[in-house]
């Protein structure tokens, strides 16, 4: 019911403009011990004190009760969705597991903030929320990145050329460590 109340509040802001006091941040959470937390987590926080709004848009929501969850996760066959949580609740959840949360406020113009806000609201519509999770190409880190990049109208430029000589599997092993069954699943 708590999530429903937040969603109801968000729906009332759908056509609203963010105030000039609004801040949008990229939230980064450190990796955890469970297989689905091994890579860390990212989300987007929208805080507008004028509108009494402080929420996190979280692309890491999934149904853990899905049959064969771990098997589907390592094979990239897990459906995830965008959820909205109050910032205090989001932070509380990570503190429970002793996983630090870092926040980087984005230096956006009012127009860019509004564009990102509208993109988040559009993504939260029922027909847009769900996506087939892929731990390399489509996940809780790539989704916020794409939204931020689009809001900035492709003014993000990177000199990143990748890890030369490393495959995705080799790179992912840095996060999975000695968990052989996770590595075996990734190798499939």
What are these regions (language model features)?
Residues 32-33, 99-107, 126-135:
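Second-shell loop/turn segments in exported
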Residues 122-188:
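Activation targets extended, charge/polar-rich intrinsically disordered C-terminal tails
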Residues 1-7:
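Sec-dependent signal peptide recognition
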């Amino acid at each position: 019911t708590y999530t429903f109340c937040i969603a109801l509040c968000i729906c009332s802001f759908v056509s609203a403009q963010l105030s000039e006091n609004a801040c949008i941040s990229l939230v980064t959470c450190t990796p955890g011990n469970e297989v689905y937390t091994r890579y860390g987590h990212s989300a987007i926080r929208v805080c507008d004190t004028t509108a009494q709004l402080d929420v996190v848009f979280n692309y890491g929501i999934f149904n853990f009760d899905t049959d064969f969850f771990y098997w589907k996760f390592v094979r990239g066959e897990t459906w995830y969705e965008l959820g909205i949580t109050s910032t205090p609740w989001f932070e509380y959840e990570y503190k429970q597991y002793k996983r630090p949360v870092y926040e980087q406020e984005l230096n956006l113009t009012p127009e860019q903030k509004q564009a990102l806000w509208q993109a988040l609201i559009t993504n939260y519509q029922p027909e847009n929320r769900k996506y087939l999770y892929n731990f390399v190409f489509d996940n809780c880190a790539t989704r916020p990145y794409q939204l931020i990049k689009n809001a900035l109208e492709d003014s993000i430029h990177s000199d990143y050329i990748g890890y030369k000589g490393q495959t995705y599997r080799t790179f992912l092993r840095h996060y999975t460590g000695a968990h052989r069954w996770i590595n075996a699943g990734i190798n499939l």
